UniProtKB/Swiss-Prot annotation:
Family stated for the protein in its record: Belongs to the universal ribosomal protein uS3 family.
Domain of life: Eukaryota
GO annotation, biological process: translation
This protein's encoding gene: rps3
Organism classification: Eukaryota, Viridiplantae, Streptophyta, Embryophyta, Tracheophyta
UniProt-recorded name of the protein: Small ribosomal subunit protein uS3c
Any Pfam family: Ribosomal_S3_C
Compartments reported by the entry: Plastid, Chloroplast
Length: 220
């Protein structure tokens, strides 16, 4: 029987990097900083989701990276729809920064919040998984949602590949099943392959559907 491993943890240190860059001098401080990083990410996700104004009702955040130094905390938000925070003179950006400063609550460390715009947000598995989840929650047929997601992601046949898997009570049927589709190559067993992965649960009236997205980017 095959044993499954997380695609990102499997490649950590080779093609994947950590999302938090810092070290702690003791276990007590380490646990405090890990919890603080989690709270910062939750704060950003909830704020963007609350103030989103695009038709898909999500901000397109691909990842959040946190860098810590003795006197500085740098938070980088990689997202596709930066207009959500930068419009109207950046009022929402300053509000978000103020909310994060309340979580950090340190007089000795300065907070630096940076927005990085992604040119092609739908080539990020997190953005694509959230898009599919919102379609399923709005009772769109899962095959139609997956087909549209593949169109948004673009053509991977000549350069990499994409795999999408949905598990649960698809279209409301009583018996749960797993459906998946793939375009191009997705070499999960190759450690040096640059594969991005994300899992996102869709909360429908029939129960939770698990959405998994793998995207292989062949830069050779």
């Amino acid at each position: 029987m095959g044993q499954k491993i997380h695609p990102l943890g499997f490649r950590l240190g080779t093609t994947q990097n950590h999302c938090s860059y810092w070290f702690a001098q003791s276990k007590k401080i380490y646990s405090k900083l890990v919890k603080e990083d989690k709270e910062i990410r939750n704060c950003i996700e909830k704020y963007v989701q609350k103030h989103t104004n695009n038709p898909f009702h999500y901000g397109g955040i691909a990842r959040i990276e946190i860098y810590r130094k003795t006197d500085l905390i740098r938070v980088e938000i990689h997202m596709g729809f930066t207009d959500l925070l930068t419009e109207n003179g950046g009022i929402r950006f300053e509000q978000l920064k103020s909310n994060i400063e309340k979580i950090v609550n340190s007089k000795n460390q300065k907070l630096c919040l940076i927005l990085i715009k992604i040119d092609k947000p739908y080539t990020e598995p997190k953005v694509l998984a959230e898009y599919i989840a919102l379609q399923l929650e709005n009772r769109v047929v899962f095959r139609k949602a997956v087909k549209k997601a593949l169109e948004l992601a673009g053509n991977f046949k000549n350069k990499g590949g994409i795999k999408i898997q949905i598990a649960g009570r698809l279209n409301g049927i009583e018996i749960a099943r797993v459906e998946w589709t793939r375009e191009g190559r997705v070499p999960l067993q190759t450690i040096r392959a640059h594969i991005n992965y994300y899992y996102y649960p869709a909360k429908t009236i029939y129960g939770i559907l698990g959405i998994k997205v793998w995207i292989y980017q062949n830069d050779e």
